[in-house]
C-alpha cells in the first residue's frame, strides 16, 4: 500500500509540473514581451525614465517608514516576553528592561534630534 501511495504522489507531481510547463509555453505565445529601444541599452546608474515626469517625494515619509519598521521589530521582540511573564526569572527581567531602556532611549534621542517632527 505504501509504494502505491508514493507512485500516486509522484504521478500527480509530474502531471502538475507538466501542466505548468505547458502553461508557460501558452503564456509566452499569447503574451509576448514588448521590445523598446531602452530595454537593451546599457546604463551606468539607475534606469532612464521613459517619460519626463519629475515627481518629488518628501523625505519625511520615508523617515517615518523607517521609524515604524524599527519600532515594529522592537515590539515583536518584546511580544514573547508578555506571554511568558510569570515563567521568566530575574535575568530575563534584567535583559528585558535593558532592551526596553534602549527602545525608549532611541525614542527620546529621535525626538531631541527633531527626527519625529514632520514638516509637510
Curated annotation (Swiss-Prot):
What is its biological role? Answer: Core subunit of the mitochondrial membrane respiratory chain NADH dehydrogenase (Complex I) that is believed to belong to the minimal assembly required for catalysis. Complex I functions in the transfer of electrons from NADH to the respiratory chain. The immediate electron acceptor for the enzyme is believed to be ubiquinone.
Keywords for this protein? Electron transport, Membrane, Mitochondrion, NAD, Respiratory chain, Translocase, Transmembrane, Transmembrane helix, Transport, Ubiquinone
State the organism named in the record: Paramecium tetraurelia
Q: Which family does it belong to?
A: Belongs to the complex I subunit 3 family.
Protein name per the record: NADH-ubiquinone oxidoreductase chain 3
According to the UniProt record, what class of enzyme is this?
A: translocase
Tell me which GO cellular component terms the UniProt record holds: mitochondrial membrane
- List, alphabetically, the InterPro entries matched: NADH_UbQ/plastoQ_OxRdtase_su3 (IPR000440), NDAH_ubi_oxred_su3_sf (IPR038430)
Q: Which reaction does it catalyse?
A: a ubiquinone + NADH + 5 H(+)(in) = a ubiquinol + NAD(+) + 4 H(+)(out)
Amino acid at each position: 500500500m505504501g509504494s502505491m501511495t508514493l507512485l500516486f504522489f509522484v504521478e500527480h507531481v509530474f502531471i502538475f509540473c507538466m501542466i505548468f510547463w505547458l502553461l508557460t509555453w501558452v503564456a509566452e505565445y499569447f503574451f509576448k514581451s514588448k521590445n523598446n529601444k531602452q530595454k537593451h541599452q546599457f546604463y551606468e546608474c539607475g534606469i532612464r525614465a521613459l517619460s519626463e515626469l519629475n515627481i518629488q517625494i518628501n523625505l519625511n515619509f520615508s523617515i517615518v517608514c523607517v521609524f515604524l519598521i524599527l519600532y515594529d521589530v522592537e515590539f515583536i521582540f518584546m511580544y514573547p516576553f508578555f506571554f511568558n511573564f510569570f515563567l521568566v526569572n530575574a535575568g530575563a527581567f534584567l535583559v528585558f528592561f535593558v532592551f526596553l531602556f534602549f527602545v525608549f532611549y532611541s525614542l527620546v534621542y529621535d525626538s531631541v534630534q527633531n527626527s519625529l517632527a514632520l514638516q509637510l
